[in-house]
Amino acid sequence: MYDEIDASAWLGKFSKVPCPEGAWIVKNKNKYYLQYATPGTICNWYCDVVLESDSVNGGFVEQPYNPVSLKVGGFIGGAGHSCVFKDKYENWWQVTSMWVGNHDEFERRIGLFPVSFDDKGRMRTHTVLGDYPMSLPQKKFNPQDISAFGWMLQSYHKKSTASSSLPGFEPEKAVDENVRT
């Protein structure tokens, strides 16, 4: 169900210092949150980190709870290069870039995940079940209550058949929980 990437094969192959991208700032209560994407745009562990400040003009401090958004398993992975917004019901959301990489290594899909801020002001992106269809709540909701989404995977590795298939496109790949197969 979870993809693994052997990053050790990449050690020593890059000489340039990576740069963060996709910076985004939001304000919640009296705190500013600067979010940006880390290197790894062609991997399912593409993610965002967050820095906090009391001023929009600076003094941002990287947070020990980083990454603030990460989704390495499930149907589709990656949760980087994001933007965060608040809807009319006061629910926070993150729109993010999810990695596919089938037809091109930079192939993407858009993801939408609920965001919350705990009582200490720590920002959290809730990626669990975020790659399943969901009905957008028409009221304020608790993003930690995963039953609010109404979906649970029932087909993982279930028996599947087809009258015909091409090599590499066998019917069992329809239920393997991987967008790249």
What is each stretch, according to the model?
Residues L70-I110:
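Repeat-solenoid scaffold signature
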Residues E21-G40, N91-V100:
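Hydrophobic core segments of beta-strands in well-ordered, beta-rich domains
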Residues Q138-T181:
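Disordered, acidic Ser/Thr/Pro-rich linker "stalks" and the adjacent N-terminal cap
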Residues V26-N28, F85-D87, D118:
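Structural WD40 beta-propeller signal
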Residues C43-L51, H103-L112:
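Structural motif
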Residues M1-Y2, V50-G59, S116-M123:
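Short loop/turn segments immediately following beta-strands, especially the blade-tip
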Residues A37-T41, W45-G74:
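A contiguous binding-surface segment within folded domains or other stable secondary-structure elements
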Residues M1-W24, G59-C83, T125-Q144, W151:
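Surface loop/turn signatures of beta-propeller and other carbohydrate-active proteins
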